[in-house]
């Protein structure tokens, strides 16, 4: 399947980046067809930056690249899920994720234990 960029007026579609191991959502960005093709070719996540109005490879300044493990396209062909391995913090603030979550298996297991205790 290929993404359908014609569904949006600006040719951009949302891209969810998820950690390949922990499954924690790292960030949300947007891609046009050129960014998608570059991401597939180079195996590093590249977005179309709406603020910079250009292609932007995550980590191009910081070195915190997102290496692509797999690319999934939703049933409507208008949203992309990329499972990636981060080379460091994902957010420009230095946080593990752009949602200020810890991206560790220990954190995930701790949250799971807390959730299970609240059900009992």
Each model region followed by its residue ranges:
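Short, charged/polar surface micro-motifs in flexible loops or helix N-caps
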Residues: 21-22, 33-36, 77, 87-89
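A short, polar/charged loop-to-alpha-helix boundary motif
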Residues: 33-47
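Active-site and channel-lining beta-strand-loop segments
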Residues: 10-32
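Short, structured beta-strand-loop surface elements
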Residues: 45-108
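Conserved small/polar residues in nucleotide/adenosyl-binding loops
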Residues: 119
């Amino acid at each position: 399947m290929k993404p359908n960029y014609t569904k949006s007026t600006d040719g951009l579609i949302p891209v969810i980046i998820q950690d390949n191991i922990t499954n924690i959502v790292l960030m949300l960005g947007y891609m046009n067809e050129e960014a998608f093709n570059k991401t597939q070719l180079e195996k590093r996540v590249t977005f179309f930056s709406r603020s910079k109005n250009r292609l932007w490879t995550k980590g191009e300044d910081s070195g915190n690249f997102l290496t692509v493990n797999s690319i999934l396209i939703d049933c409507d062909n208008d949203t992309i899920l990329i499972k990636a391995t981060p080379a460091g913090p994902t957010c420009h603030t230095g946080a593990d994720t752009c949602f200020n979550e810890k991206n560790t298996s220990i954190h995930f297991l701790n949250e799971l234990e807390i959730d299970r205790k609240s059900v009992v």
